C-alpha cells in the first residue's frame, strides 16, 4: 500500500528533489544523493487526492499530481492544495484521442499555438509550471517544442527507466509502479 511505500522511503533516508534539481541533475550541473526519488501521480484522480494526500502530509513527503485541468481542475486545486502535493500540468484538454497516425493523443495533431495555449491554461489553473506529463506519454519533436515554449523546465514520458545525467529534461523517463504491488516489488524498483 502507498503508506508502507512512503514509510519505507522515509525510514531509508530517500531524498525528494525538486523539479529544478532534477533539471540540474540531468544537465550535469548538480549531484543528487543516490537514493533520490520524485513521486508522481497522473490524472489527478479523486481516489489519489482523498487517499494519497493524507499519507504525504503525515510523512511530510513531497509529491507531484499531474492534473488534467479541464477535469474539474480548478476545484481540485482549491480543495486539495497543500504543502506536500504540488499540482502540475497533464494538459488542460489534450488527454484525449485524435493524434496523428502512430500516436494516440490529440497533442501530436495540434498546432503549436493551440498546444501552447492549452499548456498555459493548465499552468494558470495548477498554479505551477515546473513539470508536465505528456498525455499517454505520447509526444513528437513539435510537442516537446510546445512544452518548452510554454515554459516548463521538466516533462515526463512513460519510458520505463530511471533518469540519468544526459537525459533531455523535457523527455524524462519514469519508473512505473503497479497498483497492488508488494512492498518487496516496490523496494526492488527504487533501489
Q: Language model features by range: what are they?
A:
Residues 15, 130, 153:
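Short acidic/polar active-site loop segments enriched in Thr and Asp
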Residues 1-37, 162, 166, 174, ...:
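N-terminal pre-catalytic segment of deacetylase/amide-hydrolase enzymes
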Residues 41, 152-161:
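Acidic, His- and aromatic-enriched active-site or binding-groove loops in soluble protein domains
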Residues 1, 33-37, 45-47, 51, ...:
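Metal-dependent polysaccharide deacetylase catalytic core of the NodB/CE4 family, i.e.
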Residues 6-10, 53, 57, 123, ...:
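Non-transmembrane alpha-helical segments in soluble domains
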Residues 18, 65, 89, 156-157:
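Hydrophobic residues in well-ordered beta-strands that form the structural core
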Residues 140-156:
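Short, electropositive alpha-helical surface patch
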Amino acid at each position: 500500500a502507498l503508506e508502507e511505500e512512503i514509510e519505507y522511503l522515509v525510514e531509508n533516508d530517500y531524498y525528494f528533489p525538486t523539479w529544478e534539481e532534477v533539471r540540474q541533475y540531468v544537465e550535469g550541473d548538480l549531484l543528487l544523493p543516490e537514493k533520490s526519488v520524485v513521486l508522481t501521480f497522473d490524472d489527478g484522480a479523486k481516489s489519489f487526492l482523498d487517499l494519497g494526500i493524507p499519507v504525504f502530509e503525515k510523512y511530510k513527503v513531497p509529491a507531484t499530481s499531474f492534473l488534467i485541468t479541464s477535469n474539474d481542475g480548478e476545484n481540485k486545486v482549491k480543495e486539495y492544495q497543500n504543502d506536500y502535493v504540488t499540482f502540475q500540468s497533464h494538459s488542460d484538454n489534450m488527454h484525449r484521442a485524435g493524434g496523428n497516425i502512430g500516436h494516440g493523443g490529440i497533442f501530436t495533431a495540434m498546432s503549436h499555438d493551440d498546444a501552447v495555449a492549452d499548456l498555459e491554461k493548465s499552468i494558470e489553473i495548477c498554479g505551477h509550471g515546473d513539470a508536465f506529463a505528456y498525455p499517454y506519454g505520447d509526444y513528437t519533436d513539435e510537442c516537446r517544442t510546445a512544452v518548452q515554449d510554454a515554459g516548463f523546465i521538466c516533462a515526463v514520458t512513460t519510458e520505463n527507466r530511471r533518469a540519468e545525467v544526459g537525459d533531455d529534461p523535457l523527455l524524462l523517463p519514469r519508473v512505473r509502479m503497479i497498483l497492488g504491488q508488494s512492498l518487496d516489488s516496490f523496494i526492488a524498483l527504487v533501489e
